[in-house]
């Protein structure tokens, strides 16, 4: 773990750890800063092992709508419903998740490669358990108000709420910082009108629990080849076909295995809850296209941010970022109504201009900050001068009073 890390999460982990110097982290992750450690013997639950505590990252941009107030509360409620999810324990007022020892599925089997049958079957078993969990079966506090939720089985309304989040929170809220970059990439408010037309007409399907982020890095293979699902931060109730679409989009199975996953998913969800795959042939492509469109805005912002974190952006880094943006824009162009995707060179020019403008804004804010600090120093100096003057006046008054007393005494 980097020695310079001194976050609240790191300090808390060190205080709870049996051996503070053996705290591991922060682990990679977008939403949280995570630390892993062993608890002292007296604090352990069950068979021991390592545990993890997590601290939400500050100033985080959320690219996905969240449903539940607490992931830990959700995991507590899911015990007995979903197999192979992390256990929880509360220590000194902090809820910890058991750390699953093993490797991510992605570390063992990269994107675009087939998932072995043993793990593939366990993924399907997880979908079987998810579709069996209905909205009324879990008593977990939600973030959104009832009026902001789609009605039961209203798949079109469910997707529209997701589009609204992308439009308002990802696109709209970031216009001050990224508006000119979006415009240079031919992305504007009309993009969402085109997207809504493109995905219109979804069939109704009964809602169930969705993991909503089921990809190779959120699936852990332990030493006995059991598959564990982690990171339930984005879980929600909604259209079961959306969970399949998200999974297929993120997993990047080879074509044959993707087709088999779709066919097996359809059979198992219909077995558990009839109607869960209704209209899948027409609707799955629409949901996949929404994921492509959503990724355009997400990846443009993330890629731009990654450039800002580099101490120096050279031509090679800028060109690599441009290819990333061009690729995601090419895949999302049709649902967003982008008729002609800008070339890689045009994307590179747009990113370079955005970086220059951002550097200018940063320097301007720094100058404003220096001026503010200067005004504070001047104000403090004036205050010190007034205080010294008052002190001198009080000293003179005391001296005069003492002199008057001496005269009276004489």
How should these model regions be labeled?
Residues 31-68, 107-112:
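ATP-binding glycine-rich loop module of kinase domains
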Residues 78, 106-148, 181, 185-202:
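Conserved kinase catalytic-core helix
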Residues 298-375, 404-410:
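ATP/Mg2+ or Mg2+-diphosphate-binding catalytic cores
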Residues 241-275, 289-311, 328:
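Active-site activation/catalytic loop segments of kinase-like enzymes and analogous catalytic loops
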